[in-house]
Amino acid sequence: MCTGDRKMPKSILLTGSTGFVGTNLVKSLTLKSDYIVKSAVRHAVNKDDGLLFEVGDINASTDFELPLKNTTVVVHCAARAHVMDDKEAEPLTLYREVNTAGTVNLAKQAIDSGVKRFIFISSIKVNGEGTLVGCPFKTEDNHAPEDDYGLSKSEAEKQLVALAKDSSMEVVIIRPTIVYGPGVKANFASLMRLVSKGIPLPFGSITQNKRSLVSINNLVDLIVTCIDHPKAANQVFLVSDGHDVSTAEMVRELAIALDKPTWQLPVPIWCYKLFGKLFGKSDIVDRLTGTLQVDISHTKETLGWKPPQTLQEGFKQTAQAFLQANNR
């Protein structure tokens, strides 16, 4: 029987497939006939699933030989997640164990296995914690991490770049900013809960800052683009929705998405600063009132890519999932 020039599906190994980004990436990739998606997981619930490989904790000694067999592309999403005010005795050691040593170990084994491309989901924290309005982070900026999580990601990036120079494996680095979407947790979910109550909120004066956000759909679309795009090789990409918002504007857009009234009281920013100092919450206050913008022009121009989903569309989708989950 003649099969013509039909291409063989590309084998992709994904780490972090049970996390927020990984779960959504698996959903997207499995809809495409071009890919065979394998997952390296800490614990495999279904050990008969031939596409799930139990590897235990990811660190410098994790054995990836079996899942890497016949793999063309690795997408490395797994990480020790950032924790505000980490209470561990030596958080940097723990971040490095997973985010740096674990990443480099996987990359080295990928090279030995003949993997063509390694996509690393890093963090905008490699660039730093904040910017001035109108002075966004750019791809070419020097690394300037300010916390242990960002440092561990920065160190991993530098070692990956060095490995790529000495091998035939291409490395692609993606630095997301704050990611939101259906099922999002942490601070974004907390903000949605507040807005969903329809009560007056004290964010009316926070109008001069700007935050770059990225919907999970836009991030996943960029990752999928980087799997095949020839110009993605050995590049660093920043990613956002392309529309930056102040805290007050973010709350207003969320209220619209949740179909709730929005009353924002103009509490002076100095009150926030004082609260942060008195109660040891300065990091949270800085995030609430500060600016963090990213310039995605390099991403768009290099790949011919643009975010397929607007911020308003992303907020609406996120809000609908939130309301369904909470039976509202």
UniProtKB/Swiss-Prot annotation:
Reaction catalysed by this enzyme: UDP-alpha-D-glucose = UDP-alpha-D-galactose
Name the record gives this protein: UDP-glucose 4-epimerase
Family per record: Belongs to the NAD(P)-dependent epimerase/dehydratase family.
Main enzyme class: isomerase
Residues that, per the record, bind NAD(+): 20-21, 41-46, 57-58, 77-81, 123, 149, 153
GO molecular function: UDP-glucose 4-epimerase activity
Phenotype when changing residue 133 to M: In strain: O22
Superkingdom to which the source organism belongs: Bacteria
EC number: 5.1.3.2
Chain positions recorded as substrate binding sites: 123, 149, 198-199, 215-217
Cystine connections: none
Keyword Cytoplasm: no
InterPro entries noted in UniProt: Epimerase_deHydtase, NAD(P)-bd_dom_sf
Residues at the active site: 149 (proton acceptor)
Pathway: Bacterial outer membrane biogenesis; LPS O-antigen biosynthesis
Keywords: Carbohydrate metabolism, Galactose metabolism, Isomerase, NAD
Main function: Involved in the metabolism of galactose. Catalyzes the conversion of UDP-galactose (UDP-Gal) to UDP-glucose (UDP-Glc) through a mechanism involving the transient reduction of NAD.
Pfam families assigned: Epimerase (PF01370)
Assembly and interaction partners: Homodimer.
Cofactor: NAD(+)
Gene coding for it: galE
GO BP terms, alphabetized: galactose metabolic process; O antigen biosynthetic process
